[in-house]
């Protein structure tokens, strides 16, 4: 059952008619330690974690804000009634505001916007989500696992879960912090069953958290749906209205953006001005020059994903349809009712990172991928799309012992003992949705790993497979 649209407040002028913000950072990159960026980080994270995930500030300070604590910044202030968060730097020079709308998530206001500008934010309201508590997973939330979270048919998974949470076994450097691990297996009747599920204290089946770059996998699926509906072709140039006729960037194809080989200048994974500064997506993503011929260089770039979503908005040519598209065409059909895709102040999805969801919703997404983009007998993704995203990008060399890259997904089958064809999303701080196609498995791991500490998802995959006796 999909949400039904009830009302729309989208009081902005058309995108190109809106005055540009007073600053535009190349590629949306910025100094992560700049006081205005840190204040923005604290505002947007507190807003999403509190109003969407329903977590108290005391916990948010220890989890979401742990990497920016100890710098003399005052605690963010939460306005429950108006659903706002205020944050500032130690000198109170930079005052940042994040605003929550129940069906849109949180948006960080740009520095030049005031409290009186909050009503200008895009806001689509939906009917309440259906009650699926009595439906069996993945359609609903009925699971029936015992207290330890392990299906009695697979007792050997108990030790795997213990290792996943110990902060050492699957860590490149000790200190990982796992918040959830889910293992889903398809049986002989083609039913997907949750056979293991465990959470860190303070988190649970409805605990939302930022996906970081796992959002790129969701964005890829949205572009795939647009392709299935005849809006675009992978090998055709991407449709970006900000690039005029004769602009060499108009040669860049959808496929090259998907494979992180656009050839554009980029801040790489640094999009701090967009994520935490309040810069709009379009000025950040469309304003960078071409450095090399498209398709000849692989460079991980948030902007490539943001350009894909900018193109989707242009192709749809309808702001309301654009805001509804992820929910109407993907999330709600899959039963992902606990997922929100956040937007900037001009209504652009920040879909390279800023999606909030639960581990169970990520599992639903992984099941959909394992079904080759078919849901309840209906093909949502083009045939062959999953093969495309899980095939190595031509511009990136395959190196044994290093993860490969496909198209908005990472490839794990370059790692020891990992089966061929295994692919995964990968978000900062350890957000993974991993599909092992030949073994009927989906493995979700979420975390709040400290900066500089990486969780080894490939080792979790191998441990699960060994526990299930699917590999020696």
Task: Describe every region a protein language model picked out.
Residues 336-340, 387-443:
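Active-site Gly/Thr loop motif
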Residues 189-198, 271-294, 320-339:
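Short, charged, amphipathic alpha-helices and their helix-cap/turn boundaries
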Residues 88-173:
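Non-catalytic propeptide/linker segments at domain boundaries
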Residues 86, 159-203, 434, 440-444:
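A short, well-structured edge-of-sheet supersecondary motif
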Residues 229-263, 287-289, 317-353:
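Active-site helix/loop module of the DD-peptidase/beta-lactamase fold
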Residues 244-273, 277-296, 301-306, 357-360:
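Conserved catalytic neighborhood of penicillin-recognizing serine enzymes
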Residues 181, 188, 192, 209-235, ...:
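Active-site SXXK
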Residues 220, 304-312, 353-374, 431-447:
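Active-site-proximal alpha-helical segments within enzyme catalytic domains
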């Amino acid at each position: 059952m999909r949400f039904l649209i009830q009302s729309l407040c989208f009081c902005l002028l058309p995108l190109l008619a809106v005055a540009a913000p007073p600053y535009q950072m190349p590629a949306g990159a910025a100094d992560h330690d700049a006081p205005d960026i840190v204040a923005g980080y604290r505002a947007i994270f507190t807003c999403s974690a509190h109003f969407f995930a329903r977590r108290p500030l005391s916990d948010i300070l220890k989890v979401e804000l742990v990497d920016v604590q100890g710098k003399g910044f005052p605690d963010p202030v939460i306005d429950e009634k108006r659903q706002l968060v205020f944050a500032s730097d130690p000198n109170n020079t930079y005052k940042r505001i994040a605003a929550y709308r129940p069906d849109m998530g949180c948006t960080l206001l740009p520095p030049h916007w005031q409290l009186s500008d909050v009503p200008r934010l895009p806001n689509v309201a939906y009917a309440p989500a259906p009650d699926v508590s009595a439906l069996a997973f993945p359609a609903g939330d009925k699971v029936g696992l015992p207290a330890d979270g392990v299906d009695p048919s697979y007792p050997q998974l108990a030790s795997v879960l213990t290792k996943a949470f110990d902060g050492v076994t699957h860590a490149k450097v000790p200190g990982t912090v796992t918040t959830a691990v889910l293992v889903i297996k398809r049986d002989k009747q083609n039913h997907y069953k949750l056979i293991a599920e465990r959470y860190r204290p303070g988190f649970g089946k409805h605990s939302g958290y930022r996906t970081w770059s796992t959002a790129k996998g969701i964005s890829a699926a949205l572009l795939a749906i647009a392709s299935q509906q005849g809006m675009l072709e992978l090998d055709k140039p991407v449709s970006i209205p900000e690039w005029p006729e004769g602009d060499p960037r108009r040669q860049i194809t959808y496929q090259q953006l998907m494979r992180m080989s656009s050839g554009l200048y980029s801040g790489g994974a640094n999009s701090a001005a967009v994520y935490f500064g309040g810069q709009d997506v379009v000025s950040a993503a469309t304003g960078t020059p071409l450095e090399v011929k498209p398709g000849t260089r692989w460079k991980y770039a948030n902007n490539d994903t943001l350009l894909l979503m900018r193109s989707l908005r242009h192709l749809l040519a309808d702001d309301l349809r654009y805001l509804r598209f992820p929910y109407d065409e993907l999330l709600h059909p899959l039963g992902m009712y606990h997922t929100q895709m956040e937007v900037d102040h001009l209504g652009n999805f920040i879909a390279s990172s800023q999606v909030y969801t639960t581990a169970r919703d990520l599992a639903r997404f992984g099941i959909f991928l394992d079904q080759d983009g078919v849901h309840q007998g209906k093909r949502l993704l083009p045939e062959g799309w999953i093969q495309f995203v899980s095939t190595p990008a031509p511009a990136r060399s395959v190196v044994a012992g290093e993860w490969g890259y496909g198209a908005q997904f990472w490839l794990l089958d370059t790692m020891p003992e990992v089966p061929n064809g295994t692919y995964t999303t990968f978000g900062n701080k350890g957000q993974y949705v991993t599909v092992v196609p030949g073994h009927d498995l989906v493995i979700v791991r979420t975390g709040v790993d400290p900066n500089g500490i990486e969780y080894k998802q490939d080792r979790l995959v191998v441990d699960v497979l060994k526990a299930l006796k699917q590999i020696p």
